[in-house]
Amino acid sequence: MKNYSSLLIGGKKFSSRLMVGTGKYKSTQDMIESLSNSETEIITVAVRRIKNDETGENLLEKINWKKYWMLPNTAGCVNSDEAVRIAILGRELAKLSGQEENNFVKLEVIPDKKYLLPDPMETLKAAEILIKKGFSVLPYINADPILAKRLEEIGCATVMPLGSPIGSGQGLLNLSNIGIIIESAKVPVIIDAGIGVPSEASQAMELGADGVLINSAIAQAENPPLMAQAINYGVKAGRQAFLAGRIKKQDFATASSPEKNISI
């Protein structure tokens, strides 16, 4: 059944279905303008870099945390123990930003340095621990329907299958598995990683994804604020198309003009 309501994650409602990352921008100004143009409400921050990002500035001080909901992530963690420790630190940083009730964490456990693929076993282990500690866990995973269902069953707030490897810009490479995850999930499905252009963001939403998380496609564009706006439009268009319902594909043509009662 199609959900026409707002995006609901961990008991909190969001109007925007586009989450945006804060890494890789050439300047703080580019980042701030991009966040604004994207109309996002949720922004991810790497806990290990929040006090010294690529621009050398403190994100806690540069971002208006009354406007954006912080999604701390455990980027850089290679096992479950590290991820749990960084998640706890991230929750404290959210409190320092004024978000006392924020228990969100984007769970990333990535020992693979070349392709940055997430470790399914360590992700599951960390998720179980963090859920018991009261976190709303948003796990970054491969497009694995069985793992996605298992994470849902233990209480994760969303599942976040990758479209393709982080920062690769290859788009959605495993449409079949992503479709199975979307069809089977009873929690929001957020496509994370690999989206490079607005059409790919739209494609994810047309499939029925509940949202997308994008960083590199915006931050590394020639004009990040403009790309943020374009991707925002793509997400909205894809969502509307999904709700509207596309025509069925068929192997033959059907005339769009009536064939009967034609006056000459």
Swiss-Prot record:
Sequence positions that bind 1-deoxy-D-xylulose 5-phosphate: G167, A193, G194, N215, S216
InterPro entries (UniProt xref): Aldolase_TIM, Thiazole_synthase_ThiG, ThiG
BP terms from Gene Ontology: thiamine diphosphate biosynthetic process
SUPFAM superfamilies: ThiG-like
Keyword check for Protein transport: no
UniProt cross-references to HAMAP family, sorted A to Z: ThiG
Name of protein: Thiazole synthase
